[in-house]
């Protein structure tokens, strides 16, 4: 079996056709927005999902490495989405469908945290930092890190405010002009 035919997430094998279906859904959603009058629409890529703390815990092995099969799935989805948006933009008059690459910027933060002013890239700040997410990170959950701004992730999935700040300027610089 080719490595891109199936991705193992936890105990579930997911066919690549699922990722293709999602990108096709985004294509049709874009078309619906266009028909409702929208002319400038931005779509964020999938992030390097295999490098978020929860997926390092669940699929990264004992060393909690990035789960490359999940990153490959995200790259496949991003490739399909980008092509669909290009196709849509060339077929609809005055339509601007902008693919915004979050994948590579966030991956650079994760792989080179010190270059961007971070100390911790593989754990969230909340709880153990390995698996807690969203609702499990609340006022009753002890925050383990002394300085949240040292961390790229708040919980095991979502970036911190500091990480978002590090992403916003390059994202705007690379993409804002594509809307006009």
Model-predicted segments: where are they?
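Extracellular glycan-modifying ectodomains
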Residues: 2-4, 82-86, 112, 158-159
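Residue-level signature of catalytic and energy-coupling elements of molecular machines
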Residues: 41, 81, 101, 160
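Residue-level preference for long, well-ordered alpha-helices that form the structural scaffold
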Residues: 3, 15-22, 63-77
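C-terminal helix/juxtamembrane-tail motif
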Residues: 155-180
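Extracytoplasmic/secreted proteins, especially bacterial periplasmic and envelope-associated proteins
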Residues: 21, 25-28, 72, 76, ...
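Mobile gating loops/cap/lid regions near enzyme active sites that modulate substrate access
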Residues: 48-68, 72-75, 87-90, 94-157
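A structural motif corresponding to the C-terminal end of an alpha-helix
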Residues: 29-39, 77-97
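Oxyanion-hole/transition-state-stabilizing segment in secreted/luminal serine hydrolases
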Residues: 1-20, 32-35, 39-58, 151, ...
């Amino acid at each position: 079996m080719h490595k891109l035919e199936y991705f193992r997430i936890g105990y579930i094998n997911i066919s690549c056709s699922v990722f293709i279906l999602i990108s096709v859904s985004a294509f049709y959603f874009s078309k619906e927005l266009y028909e409702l009058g929208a002319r400038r629409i931005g779509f964020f890529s999938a992030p390097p999902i295999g490098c978020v703390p929860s997926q390092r815990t669940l699929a990264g092995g004992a060393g909690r490495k990035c789960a490359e099969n999940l990153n490959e799935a995200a790259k496949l989805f991003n490739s399909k989405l980008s092509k669909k948006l290009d196709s849509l933009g060339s077929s609809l008059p005055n339509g601007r469908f902008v693919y915004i690459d979050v994948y590579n910027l966030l991956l650079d933060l994760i792989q080179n945290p010190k270059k961007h002013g971070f100390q911790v890239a593989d754990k969230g700040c909340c709880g153990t930092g390995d698996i807690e997410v969203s609702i499990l990170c609340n006022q009753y959950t002890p925050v383990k890190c002394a300085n949240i701004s040292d961390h790229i992730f708040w919980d095991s999935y979502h970036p911190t405010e500091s990480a978002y700040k590090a992403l916003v300027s390059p994202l705007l610089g690379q993409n804002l002009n594509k809307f006009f």
